[in-house]
Amino acid sequence: MAAYTAIDDPEAYFQAEAYTGTGSTRTVTLSADTDMQPDVVWIKKRASNYNHNLFDSVRGVNKGMYVNNDAVEHDSNADGYLSAFSSDGFQVQAGSSTSDYVNVDGETYVAWCWKETADAGFDMVTYTGNETARTISHSLSAVPHFMTVRNRTATNDWLTYHHKNTAAPETDYLYLNLDSATQDQDIQWNDTAPTSSVFSVGTSGYTNGNTDGHIIYLWTGKQGYSKFGGYTGNGNADGAFIFCGFRPAFV
């Protein structure tokens, strides 16, 4: 294993966990063999059309963002929230009016959990926008393959970069929360590719809104653990086969 990848234990950096809500304080313990304190927890109620809720250790507990829409960062007290990150999981709490989003009694949920570390190719950066094209440092020590950024205080969509999106991906972007096709604007990434130490933003309110708080999540591929690529569909019932070099836990 070590000859193929430096990550011998992927469960130390990513785990997916299904759990059932209790309607009150609920400690969710990750069931894999390896203990992991997550830095990002993305929660979805499985049987209903409620929003995807994202929490992270940089913004802090009880600060949710919906991955599937453009709502601003919210205090989740009313609808249930993540109240703590633990050494091997997290804690969810019922809200003051309902617990629908994370912890309804008897309802099933899935949580995708990441550990922030350059070893596994994942970083988070918060910054304040200034509407001036510039570079911002990250800690991956490698070129990001995938980035998604969110203006925390404005009703903007999730601006997303993928290194295989087009021949010149730094000139283009996708929306994580919309089904729109690829778009081209230099005001998003300033038409500048990210490097092993910085990423670029332009003058857009999506990536660099003046005085607005932003958070960006950055990943780079790690052989045997994560991969960010593209494929061409073939229209066949069996579909196209996409080789990752490992069995993925999250697609």
Please report, for each region that a protein language model flagged, where it lies by residue.
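Surface-exposed molecular-recognition determinants
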Residues: 1-250
